[in-house]
Amino acid sequence: SARQEVAVLPTPVQLTTQSGMFVLKNGLKIGVSDESLLPAAQYLQTILQNAVISTAEVGGQPADIFLKLTDTKGKEGAYKLNVTSGNIVAEAADYSGIISAISTLRQLLPAAIEQSSQDASHSIPAVSIEDAPRLAWRGMMLDASRHFWNKEEVKHVLDMMALYKLNKFHWHLTDDQGWRIEIKQYPLLTAK
């Protein structure tokens, strides 16, 4: 079978495609090496919720997907991601590296997984990736001072920032007399 083209942004330091696919299935088990990674596992569960029912647990080896804190001897945010037909292992020295690995994994998923109630089979190409941020500051500015952005729109922007591993959010909230966040305790801020 032909290997699926793999596109990840930003381009990883090293990406090697391998033969095979990891097939997502109900009952998928997400294991973590440390309790501090449970929020990351829950974030991954949220990403996968339209495709599979999964569980997350500490020390969950063997696991279909395993998130592991380990000394990668890399800089902050560095990670290794290995996808085979049998399992997925993400390793990083810190939490931000694990989140970056999850963001990469999300990019490897078929786009259809982002839609609700998928009954189709989904798979992830087998790859080996090593990556680290090349810039300490990868950000975006949202200028909300000229028109109102509702909560869901802002959350979507933040979600897209996470997908592309942007790590700084500048929220331009006010210009001169304009104030764009409703604070119930101070209603005059948005009334004038």
Language model features with spans:
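Long, contiguous hydrophobic alpha-helical segments, chiefly transmembrane helices and signal peptides
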Residues: 137, 142, 173, 186-189
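The substrate-binding groove and active-site-proximal loops of carbohydrate-active enzymes
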Residues: 92, 138-151, 192
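Loop/helix-junction capping segments adjacent to catalytic residues or to phosphate/diphosphate-binding pockets
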Residues: 38, 99, 148-151, 180
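Acidic, contiguous N-terminal accessory segments
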Residues: 1-138
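Single-residue recognition of alpha-helix capping/boundary positions
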Residues: 36-40, 153, 185
